[in-house]
Every structure is written in C-alpha cells, then in structure tokens.
Amino acid sequence: MSFTLAIIGRPNVGKSTLFNRLVGQKLALVDDAPGVTRDRREGEGRLGDLNFTLIDTAGLDEGPKGSLTARMQEQTETAIELADALLFVFDARAGLTPNDRAFADFARRANKPVVLVANKSEGKSGEIGAMESYALGLGDPVQISAEHGEGMGELYDALRPLLPEPVEDEEDDEPADQSEEAIATRPIRVAIVGRPNAGKSTFINRLLGEERLLTSPEAGTTRDSIAVEVEWKGRDFRVFDTAGLRRRSRIEEKLEKLSVADALRAVRFAEVVVLMMDAQNRFEEQDLRIADLVEREGRALVIAVNKWDLIERQGGQIAQLRTDADHWLPQIKGVPIVATSGMLGEGVDRLMQAIQDAYAVWNRRVPTAALNRWFEQAISQNPPPAVSGRRLKLNYVTQTKARPPSFVVFCSRADAVPESYLRYLVNSLRGAFDLPGTPVRITLREKANPFAHKRKRKS
C-alpha cells in the first residue's frame, strides 16, 4: 500500500530542496525567490528502506480570492488532504516567523501525523532556531540540512513509525531489454510543450477531470515540469506539463531560465512530445524552433492546435494546417495535427489516440525483406548522382534501432553523397512505411572494398 507524505511550509524554507533530496533527482526547481513552486508535484521518494509518494507544495501565502496566490494555497490544501502524514518544514536559521506559527495551527487542524523539520540547521543560529520550534507544540524538531544531506538518519527515525513495513522492490528483477509486449503496455512518457499561455495546463486539467495544474490568464503560470499519471482507454500515460518555451533573448529572469531548462529536460525524458499552439497564433517562429528541437532530440511529435473554439470559420482549416506543417517542418513530414479546446474539453480523445499512434510509429521496426525491396526500388527510380564523373554506389540498408527508426546505408563514398539525395531517401522511406511525425535517421557508411589492396599491388 502506497504511503503519501506532503512537504508543507511557508515559501522559501527549502521544501523543494528536501523533495529533490528524497526523490533522488532534481525534479523541482530550487531558487531563492519565494513562491518558486506553484503547482503540487509528486515523486517516488526513498529514505533507506522506506518507500513513499512525496508531494512538494507551494508555500501557503494568503492572497485575494481568485488570485494566483490563493489558487496556490488551494493546491496545497488539496495535497494535505491526499497525504497520510505531513513534513512541516521551517527555516531554522531565520527562526520562527508569524507565518510559521499560523502554519502550525493549519497543520494541527489537518488532524494528521506531523513531523516537524528544522531545515538549514547548520551552525549556532540554526541550533537556536530549532530550539524555538518547541513553542509550536508539534513535538521534537528533526534538525537537517536538505542541501547538504545532513540529518537524514534522524529524519528516517522520525518517519519509520509512521510508515507500513517495507516490502521488497519487485522491479529489481525486470530485464533491461524489454519485449514488444512490455513496450506496448508500459506508461507512455509525454511532454506537453509550447509557448507560454498556449493552454497546456488547462488541457491536462480537462484530461484529468480536476484542477491539478494552476491555470491563469497570465503567461508563465507553470514554472516546473509537472508530471501526472493519466489512464486513457486502459493505457497508462505519464504526462509532463512544462513551462512555456520562449526565445532565449526574451528569457530575462534567472527563474525563467531554470524553467526553460526544466522544460528541455522534460522533452529529453519524453517519448512523445505534444507541441501545443494557440489556434489564433500558430506556426510562429518559436513554435518552429520547438519543433526543430523535438526532431533533433529524436522524439515523436504531435501538434495540438488549442483554443480551436475561438476560430470562427473552421471549415477546411485543418487541411490548411497540414499543408502549413509540411511547408514549415519538412524534416518531420506528416506530423499529426489535432484541433483541441482545453476549455471545452474538445479533441481530448483524438489527441490521446494521436499520441498512442505516434508512439507506435516511433517504436516501429521495418521487416528486413520489405526494407530491401524499398531500397532497390528507391535507387532504381532515382539513382544516386555521379560525383566527379564517377557514379556513387549504394550497396544495402539495415535498420540499426527504433525509438526513433534509424537506418544505415552502406555505400562506396559516404562523404560524396549529396544532402539532397539523403533527404530523398528519408522522405521515400517515410512514405513507403507510413512513418509520419517521427524523426527518421539514415546514416551513410562506407563499405570496405576487399579488392582495393590487390588493385594497388597490381598497378
């Protein structure tokens, strides 16, 4: 049975640093500015033999009803409701503040086990601040330094009585090379990217049926890459909502730079990337840059044109979108395009099906016999050109891997094959085997000539 811990506390006391420490990887943004964590984030935490689900929350600042700050508070309250126990973190160096005391009252009202965590306890000032916390009436403080990993043993001792007995990790015996059946059943990792305020979080909330991610008219509401689990028609998906990707020249704040880097990491971690565009401002320069990044990273691509409900004359526009996509994105011809409305919930099923189809294409292996037939036909219809009076010879092709589909063509002079002919092979192969929206890699490799040495000796 899963045990859930929520890390709570006022802003900038080190909650995300502790989250990263326990999850074992840098999933949450960490910065000196208060309010860096806006959404609640979840991860699988481990401390010794203790395994648990960990929730990182926004700090509870009071704000006007309906404001972004107030909705951050609602997210935190929801996380507390979901948790089995609370890690109440305060800054021992700063000592107790009125907000900490108000927060302690809030934690007590939750009627759940509370572990009081005195973070930043290094040095004499940290020791004094930790002693002050007895006034909160929440028991002995656990003194730690999340940044340096100090006090984890003491935190283990405090958590051990709260958690059920540890069980053996059954995943250790899983083979490294997964079968086709495993690929067909494991969760598909999906990153939803796009320019700020394209409606990414609104769409995921519609998919989940709850306001899991903060949404706001102001661009840049999502700062972290938020991972959520989704089940659709019996298939599991792990969906990452990311910070909007802007042009680097417009990224001014350090925090926004961290957010963009976080989004780029999500793209690299994903298997399928959904590029979400605003229907009223589509195929702008930054959209094309993002699509190019996805192709270079070798990920399957699906384009979601969101806020489609705001388009008045929709007839024929999808066909025009496909034409525009092939024009602007020739390196990923045939990319699937789905019109959606996160606000109205339209296009959800179509997009999820497109993601699943794109994942299948990304994993595709072409049968050897069919690949050989295509290769012979392709070079017969359009033979490689002559270079310096000598015709290039392409010998044979083989698929080296999937994810994305990658091939090697063995030939006589690899460095002499024009880029235009390589593009011809890629587009021909993509069309022959129905590989839309996924990068197709063809590498040229010279085949050793066993008679070259003999000819040299004879001459």
From Swiss-Prot:
Domain EngA-type G per the UniProt entry, residue ranges: 3-167, 188-363
UniProt entry keywords in alphabetical sequence: GTP-binding, Nucleotide-binding, Repeat, Ribosome biogenesis
KH-like domain span: 364-448
Superkingdom of the source species: Bacteria
Function: GTPase that plays an essential role in the late steps of ribosome biogenesis.
Protein family membership: Belongs to the TRAFAC class TrmE-Era-EngA-EngB-Septin-like GTPase superfamily. EngA (Der) GTPase family.
Protein name: GTPase Der
Source species taxonomy: Bacteria, Pseudomonadati, Pseudomonadota, Alphaproteobacteria, Hyphomicrobiales
Gene that encodes the chain: der
